[in-house]
Regions:
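Non-catalytic, glycine-rich low-complexity segments
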Residues: 1-40, 103-133
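Short solvent-exposed strand-capping/beta-turn motif centered on an Asx-Ser/Thr pair
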Residues: 38-42, 79-81
């Protein structure tokens, strides 16, 4: 199917008259944004609020955090007077889906070598966005994932909280 969207974003708040009128805030006040964000299935999803002042060229981004059910929330600060534009963006996080699926297989004592090779590809794809210390960790993880003699270390890295955070 063409143009198939897997992420649904509804009930973005605050808004007035379905977004036809601007909300009001003063300088240094926070805009608390909530939205219902969900997907068709059990994939791990992530979302963010993108915002910018009317005179800015670049969008700023704040990651949203899940609260109850399918509701997500985040806040950004009004830093200068004027009009701000914001929207919520959501996506399926394939790397986190890989990590959660691999973790379940490891807990079930399954051999996950092919999953580790897949993980090495995910790790390599995010290296350019990583900080120097994160890149060092990712390079170590990718090396372990592709070296069968380091399988035990590789599965520990695959399900690590550090990898999850990156």
């Amino acid at each position: 199917m063409q143009n198939q969207t897997r992420i649904v974003i509804e009930n973005v708040m605050p808004q007035l008259d379905c977004g036809s009128n601007p909300i009001k805030r003063i300088v240094n006040q926070k805009v608390n944004v909530t939205a219902a964000v969900f997907s068709d299935g059990h994939d791990v999803i992530e979302c963010c609020v993108k915002f910018k002042h009317e005179n800015d060229k670049k969008w700023q981004e704040v990651r949203m955090k899940p609260s109850v059910n399918d509701e997500w929330s985040a806040a950004f600060k009004v830093e200068k007077q004027g009009f701000y534009t914001y929207f919520v963006e959501g996506w399926v996080d394939y790397a986190l889906n890989w990590q959660h699926g691999t973790e379940r297989k490891i807990q079930d004592n399954q051999y996950v070598k092919s999953e580790l090779l897949e993980g090495a590809e995910y790790v390599k794809s995010v290296m350019e966005l990583a900080t120097d210390s994160e890149r060092e960790y990712l390079e170590k993880a990718a090396a372990h994932f592709t070296n069968e003699s380091e399988y035990d270390q590789a599965i520990q890295l695959a399900v690590s909280a550090e990898l999850h955070q990156i």
